[in-house]
Amino acid sequence: MTTKLAQFLGIMLYVLVAGVMWGTWLSLGRTMTRYDAATFLADGKHMIANLAVVMAVLMITACLMGFAMVALLLRSGSRLAAGLALAGLLLMVGVLVVTLAVEVPLDNRIKTWTLATLPADWQGLRERWAIFHTVRTFLSLAAVAAAVAATLVGRSDRTGTEVAHRPALAGDRDTRSIG
């Protein structure tokens, strides 16, 4: 796989993850703490059913592609780009950790609730979900920014100095010395 293809696929996966996070935060996350129990349960159960499997696949695939981006950029000698890609990968891993450590356990509890069986602290748990969703939303956006930045930096020369490259133009001569 070429480095640019890996970067393209990685960015697309990061954007898909961040897009779902951002859309949820923008449309629901900022107001869901004011939902009554019936609305919270109905919306929550629909979202869990629609997103659980899709997001598991997207987040894991995004992290794997992020690892590929870092490895390919390191191999190409672009340390700055690799560092930015690594930052993006670590941010995306942070999204996965928050999801698995906080959000999924809460989702698994919410899936079992009915209006009759809501725990006494359901509002606090709802608020906890919203807070951690905000955290992972902005981690995912930062991951996208880092991955995009990695594609925008120049390729390193052998000394590690970042250099800008322009495409070769017709009529350009190779000025490298022989020997």
Predicted segments, located by residue:
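Interfacial segments of alpha-helical transmembrane regions
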Residues: 2-15, 71-94
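Hydrophobic residues within the alpha-helical transmembrane core of Major Facilitator Superfamily
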Residues: 15, 67, 93, 145-148
